[in-house]
């Protein structure tokens, strides 16, 4: 029987970055290849009804070993890693019995995981921690989740004395580019409720996400020779700058926390003739979320009024909503996860997700899906790390949740 660390180290060797630019499903071929490998592994450990569809979704079943009817639960993780940093040739290192000091990730490039910048690592002093070599991300988001789920399923198969109902396993592509639930067949999956293992540090239990939208701002300028441009030229670069400055300067990711929302400018492409701004809009409160969408549209209207012509076009598109609306209808799914953590000596930390998970969309598709910790920290970057014990406890948590549903 493989342990969770062995699985994790094997999975991160496979580059499964998703792509913002691709229109294929999944967005990268390597995700489909990885999905097929996972499907074979699920069959090998003894799961039933294993399927890998053409879109890269993996599903499988662990059959009930009890007579009474209990809810069918699902455990879900995503296969892709973030496009934000390379996932090619990940070269992990295990820092044994971490001593509480700065960790040199790459001596040659002077890349150091410093405790004054990432103080949360001190919580794991004395533990074994998996880190990067400073050149890539680690992939704990979310291959730690995959390793934990499969390890838990194998444990349940090898320990039939632990009673459980029917359990569904699902692995999705393209979560990191917001498409993880696009082709997820909730009916085929067949669960009454589910949990994603896509959270951060040990103990995190999340049932709230942002409401999310994206906005594309197109600015049409007019280029005229600068020598004769007076009262003729409209410089789209300067209009773009005006637009940016008309949104609240403190309502940005780097100046907000907790339940505070924001406007996040992702990219700017501009020249005199035309400019394009790409934003994401986030807020936990549905009313404030709607107000933010109107606010960014209003900026465009004001600029058009100032120039007395339609030079700014703002297109806003919703992405996902705060899953709390749906989780609150079946609050016991959170209560059971809370009790399961307590039962294995983990202190639950109820926190809002300042982001989204597949569970955000799935909850609105009829599958209530709160999020559990996978154990990692500093996702999407070279300072990503995951304590080995956190992964082991996440696998143990999956087992305990299954057990509590059987005894419910």
Curated annotation (Swiss-Prot):
Chemical reaction(s) catalysed: Release of the N-terminal residue from a tripeptide
Keyword Ribonucleoprotein tagged: no
A GO term, aspect molecular function: tripeptide aminopeptidase activity
EC number: 3.4.11.4
GO terms of biological process kind: peptide catabolic process; proteolysis
UniProt: Zn(2+) 1 binding residues: 78, 141, 198
GO CC, one annotated term: cytosol
Enzyme class at the top of the EC tree: hydrolase
Keywords: Aminopeptidase, Cytoplasm, Hydrolase, Metal-binding, Metalloprotease, Protease, Zinc
Cofactors, names only: Zn(2+)
Localization per record: Cytoplasm
Highest taxon listed in the record's lineage: Bacteria
Co-factor binding comment: Binds 2 Zn(2+) ions per subunit.
Chief place where the protein resides: cytoplasm
Active site positions, chain numbering: 80, 175 (proton acceptor)
PROSITE patterns: ARGE_DAPE_CPG2_1, ARGE_DAPE_CPG2_2
Binding-site positions, Zn(2+) 2: 141, 176, 380
Function in brief: Cleaves the N-terminal amino acid of tripeptides.
HAMAP family according to UniProt: Aminopeptidase_M20
Family: Belongs to the peptidase M20B family.
Name assigned to this protein: Peptidase T
Gene source species: Clostridium botulinum (strain Kyoto / Type A2)
